[in-house]
Amino acid sequence: MSSAVQEARPAERTDPARPGRSVRTLRYLTLALTALLLLGAGWTAATLTTDRTPGEESAEAGFARDMSRHHAQAVEMAMLAYAKGQDPAIRQIGYDMALTQQAQIGHMQRWLQEWELLPTGSRPAMEWMPDGVRVDQDGLMPGMATREEITQLHEAQGAEVDRLFIRLMIDHHLGGVHMADGLLKVSDRPEVVRLAQASKQAQQKEINELRKLELANG
């Protein structure tokens, strides 16, 4: 191509008064990125607000600690029912209960580790409950069996194991449901709420099953 032709062809450029496609595209990208950054900042702020780590005196920490201890006694009683019960239905419910509640203990203890809190706290048990429920003089939470009752269950045999287990576990589960309800009144932390709801539902179901077995076993 001759130099004359090259000189005759207008140089390709973008008129500042009429932005070309490349300028418009860059502008749109800039606006989109700005919007995304603002959206991300708002989402992060909201997340930090709702996902704040529970502290030492929080209801979530109190629930995790107290329900772990409450569940631990239920697991002990359930394993005795599984090992020594006479009715196959009692042994089965004991087995299922021990697995479920031991798994929930694992979840709650993991939360405490993630929140950098100790398994036990300095506050009295149940102080986090909104209705002011307190432990009894022996330090037992609602529904928990006394040491003497646990000893009786250890020493019982056959049908007596079934009867003792049913009576003690119904009371124990009623206390556990009450604790779960207390947490649900004051917490909106998703994982804690989910576990409390699942625990409440499972215990209510087992209370109904135990009451049917109580009638069947006299």
List each language-model region with its residue ranges.
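All-alpha RGS (Regulator of G-protein Signaling) helical domain and cognate RGS-like helical scaffolds
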Residues: S2, R18-G218
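N-terminal intrinsically disordered, acidic low-complexity segments at the extreme N-terminus
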Residues: M1-E12
